[in-house]
């Protein structure tokens, strides 16, 4: 391919005549030696691997490395090369064993020569003469001229070439039959003539018929000429003519099904499924055309909003398709509730009429067709349930009768970026339409560096994780971004666009220009009301965005984002280590949950200071090991996962700060995490993890000695104990959050517990 087989390389031209002494066994040995010298993970282009091959290691018997290389070049020219060298050698082995099999059948020395076509006979006869007359012409130009000359030949002269061709063709067929008798082993994949032929599609039936007609008029036409002539005619056929071939295809398919069922009974060893027999030969468009002519009713719009849009769009042929739905949505909002209710009733009536007509249509069909239509209706209903109306974003304001909800916009990194930059671009370039603005934002996104994209991808991952954690309606509500704020001019335009479109007969371009001029000529006092509305809309957007980004406290404390392979967080101090030990050994399982934690607190008070120090050292050692494992794990993450983990840690700190209230110890770390989350991921993740651990250590050290009388800490850790009792795996998953809560409660009660600890040390 690509001229490799036709143009011999320097190596081929230099091949000595001694190469003929290679036997089949020697060639197979050569390929086996090459195979043994291939790299274990061979995935490069074959030329690359071939250039690195050590041919001296391939050499065997009295064949040197150079001889082996030359022979390989000769063999490799006989097989396709768009593969790895490993695959190529396997194919070469097959070629050496069966050099004349399959596609290489015509290369067998005994294979009869095919006769030249009438046109090619004429071409070979006249080419030399025309080449002398026009030496400046290329082969391509000569071919074009001779092709034109042949078409202009009278039928009598053409007949001479046709008769010579037919005579030689008969001789070729006799020689071919003789060749097949002499070489039966070379004829592979003989067609099983007893298997019924598969039914044709309507287009195939039409093409076969038209081809016969065309060849009667032009018997010397090539296959390419027939295809070029008939190629586009099928799509230009009228529905009535196409329906004729659809009916013929259906009749042929029924006959095929009956014949195939009889055939399968006679040949039970064949593994042919019922689905393979009954597979339709019609396309979706052809099936719909047939159903339409059979009287199948057209499905009505699914809701009142869709019905309104369908009626409005019939008069909006001049409006660009990208703007039609926007205009429909704006017009729908301007309708009164009474008008919307009228459309709702009209839609319900259309649905009832459709059901009656569909039942009549089904009665006229055979049972198999009834099942097919009912199946299609079921699938349509499933799909339509997900198709919602963009008109009723606030059902409480419109009574909930104006149609279904607007489909949610997909939460993606590019979408978050677009929403963030859209308002700024609208102010900088007000002349751009919505579609032009969207294209510009897409180009801006593509030009962003990977580091900057990672920031938005992290926010995407956080949003998706939040939507997965939230149940039911809350998940749906928070899983999408709030509607972007509108400018004062946009709010004013929405309120008056109906009047302007009516004035300019639905010419949207003229209406927009007129509105723009009116707005520019308005006094500031007149604009003030709309500016206030825009400011309120901006506040609404910022409020909804902050609510969406900030995870709810209850959800954050009960569930956490899971990262595969993240090391398990160890106890933060000696008291937690002591509690974990008692809870895990099952010694206190007979006690209720609260009593169990009280018992742990009392036991902690009773142990000596040296034992407490022992547990503290164990906790510190586990913390050191945890830091090492965490660093290794963070480095092993992909850039996207690392950014998502960083975003999660930052959000977790913010939420914990809100829960704790003002904390002088954590204020520095909180501010640091805020600044880190706003940068473009240029800091090292290891430093962030160390900051997090330092914060945890501070909380742990301050609360360690005060853990003996901290009842709130005991209640927090009781969650861990309960999970340990019911399921050890749940304990592992939620332990991190429990420990954070322990730190919080222990930190808040450190002042009260310090007196208890001092009295305990005095008693000791």
Curated annotation (Swiss-Prot):
It comes from the Eukaryota. It is linked to Neurodegeneration, childhood-onset, with brain atrophy: An autosomal dominant neurodegenerative disease with onset in childhood, characterized by progressive cortical atrophy, developmental delay, developmental regression, loss of motor skills and ambulation, absence of language, and intellectual disability. This is Nucleolar transcription factor 1. The gene is UBTF. The modification Phosphoserine is found at residues 273, 336, 364, 389, 412, 433, 435, 484, 495, 546, 584, 638. GO terms for biological process: positive regulation of transcription by RNA polymerase I; transcription by RNA polymerase I; transcription initiation at RNA polymerase I promoter. The keyword Repressor does not apply. Keywords: Acetylation, Activator, Disease variant, DNA-binding, Intellectual disability, Neurodegeneration, Nucleus, Phosphoprotein, Repeat, Transcription, Transcription regulation. It is found in: Nucleus, Nucleolus. Residues 746-758 have a biased composition (Low complexity). PANTHER family: NUCLEOLAR TRANSCRIPTION FACTOR 1, UPSTREAM BINDING TRANSCRIPTION FACTOR. The modification Phosphothreonine is found at residue 201. One of its GO terms (cellular component) is nucleoplasm. Residues 677-745 have a biased composition (Acidic residues). Residues 112-180, 196-264, 298-362, 407-475, 482-549, 568-634 bind DNA. The modification N-acetylmethionine is found at residue 1. Homodimer. Part of Pol I pre-initiation complex (PIC), in which Pol I core assembles with RRN3 and promoter-bound UTBF and SL1/TIF-IB complex. Interacts with TOP2A in the context of Pol I complex. Interacts with TBP. Interacts with TAF1A. Interacts with RASL11A. Binds to IRS1 and PIK3CA. Interacts with DHX33. Interacts with PHF6. Interacts with CEBPA (isoform 1 and isoform 4). Interacts with DDX11. Interacts with NOP53. Interacts with ALKBH2. Recognizes the ribosomal RNA gene promoter and activates transcription mediated by RNA polymerase I (Pol I) through cooperative interactions with the transcription factor SL1/TIF-IB complex. It binds specifically to the upstream control element and can activate Pol I promoter escape. One of its GO terms (molecular function) is scaffold protein binding.
């Amino acid at each position: 391919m690509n001229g490799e087989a036709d143009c011999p390389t320097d190596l081929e031209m230099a091949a000595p005549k001694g190469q003929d002494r290679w036997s089949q066994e020697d060639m197979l040995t050569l390929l086996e030696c090459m195979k043994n010298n291939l790299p274990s993970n061979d995935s490069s282009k074959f030329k690359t691997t071939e250039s690195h091959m050590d041919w001296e290691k391939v050499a065997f018997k009295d064949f040197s490395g150079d001889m082996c290389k030359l022979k390989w070049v000769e063999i490799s020219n006989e097989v396709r090369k768009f593969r790895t060298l490993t695959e190529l050698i396997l194919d070469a082995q097959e070629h050496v064993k069966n050099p004349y099999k399959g596609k290489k059948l015509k290369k067998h020395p005994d294979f009869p020569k095919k006769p030249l076509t009438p046109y090619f006979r004429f071409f070979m006869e006249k080419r030399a003469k025309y080449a002398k007359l026009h030496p400046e012409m290329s082969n391509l130009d000569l071919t074009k001229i001779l092709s034109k000359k042949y078409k202009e030949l009278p039928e009598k002269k053409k007949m001479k070439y046709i008769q010579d061709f037919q005579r030689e063709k008969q001789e070729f067929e006799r020689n071919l039959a003789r060749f097949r008798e002499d070489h039966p082993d070379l004829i592979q994949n003989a067609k099983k003539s007893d298997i019924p032929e598969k039914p044709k599609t309507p287009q195939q039936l039409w093409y076969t018929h038209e081809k016969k007609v065309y060849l009667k008029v032009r018997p010397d036409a090539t296959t390419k000429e027939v295809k070029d002539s008939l190629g586009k005619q099928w799509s230009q056929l009228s529905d009535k003519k196409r329906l004729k071939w659809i009916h013929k295809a259906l009749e042929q398919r029924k006959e095929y099904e009956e014949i195939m069922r009889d055939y399968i009974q006679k040949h039970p060893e064949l593994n042919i499924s019922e689905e393979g027999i009954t597979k339709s030969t019609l396309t979706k468009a052809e099936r719909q055309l047939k159903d339409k002519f059979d009287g199948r009713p057209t499905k009505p719009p699914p809701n009142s909003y869709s019905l309104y849009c369908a009626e409005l769009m019939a008069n909006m042929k001049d409006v660009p398709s990208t703007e039609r739905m926007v205009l429909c949505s704006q017009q729908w909002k301007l309708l009164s509730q009474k008008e919307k209710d009228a459309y709702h009733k009209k839609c319900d009536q259309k649905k009832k009429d459709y059901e009656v007509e569909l039942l009549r249509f089904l009665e006229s069909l055979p049972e198999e067709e009834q099942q097919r239509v009912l199946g299609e209706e079921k699938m349509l209903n499933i799909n339509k349930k997900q198709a919602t109306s963009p008109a009723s974003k606030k059902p409480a304001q419109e009574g909930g009768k104006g149609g279904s909800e607007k489909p949610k916009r997909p939460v993606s990194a590019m979408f978050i970026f677009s929403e963030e930059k859209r308002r700024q671009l609208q102010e900088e370039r007000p002349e751009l339409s919505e579609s032009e603005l969207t294209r510009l934002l897409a180009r801006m996104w593509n030009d962003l560096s990977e580091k900057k994209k990672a920031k938005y991808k992290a926010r995407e991952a956080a949003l998706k994780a939040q939507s997965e954690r939230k149940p039911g309606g809350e998940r749906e509500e928070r899983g999408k971004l709030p509607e972007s704020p509108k400018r004062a001019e946009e709010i004013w335009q929405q309120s008056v666009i109906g009047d302007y479109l009516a004035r300019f007969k639905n010419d949207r371009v003229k209406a927009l220009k007129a509105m723009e001029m009116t707005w520019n000529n308005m006094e500031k006092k007149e604009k003030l009301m709309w500016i206030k509305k825009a400011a309120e809309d901006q506040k609404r957007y910022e409020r909804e965005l902050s609510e969406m980004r900030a995870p709810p406290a209850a959800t954050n404390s009960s569930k956490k984002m899971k990262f595969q392979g993240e090391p398990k967080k160890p106890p933060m101090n000696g008291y937690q280590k002591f509690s974990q030990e008692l809870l895990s050994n099952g010694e206190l399982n007979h006690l209720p949950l609260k009593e169990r934690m009280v018992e742990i607190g009392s036991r902690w008070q009773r142990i000596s200071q040296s034992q407490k120090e022992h547990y503290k050292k164990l906790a510190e050692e586990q913390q050191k090991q945890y830091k090492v494992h965490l660093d290794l794990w963070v480095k092993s993450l992909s850039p996207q996962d690392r950014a998502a983990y960083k975003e999660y840690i930052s959000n977790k700190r913010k939420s914990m700060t809100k829960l704790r209230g003002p904390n002088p110890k954590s204020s520095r770390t909180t501010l640091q995490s805020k600044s880190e989350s706003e940068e473009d991921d240029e800091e090292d993740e290891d430093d962030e993890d160390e900051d997090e651990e330092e914060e945890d250590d501070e909380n742990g050290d301050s609360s360690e000695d005060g853990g003996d009388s901290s009842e709130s800490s005991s209640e927090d850790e009781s969650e861990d104990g309960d999970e340990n009792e019911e399921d050890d795996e749940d304990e592992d998953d939620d332990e991190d959050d429990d420990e954070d809560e322990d730190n919080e409660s222990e930190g808040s009660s450190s002042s009260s517990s310090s007196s208890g600890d001092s009295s305990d040390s005095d008693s000791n």
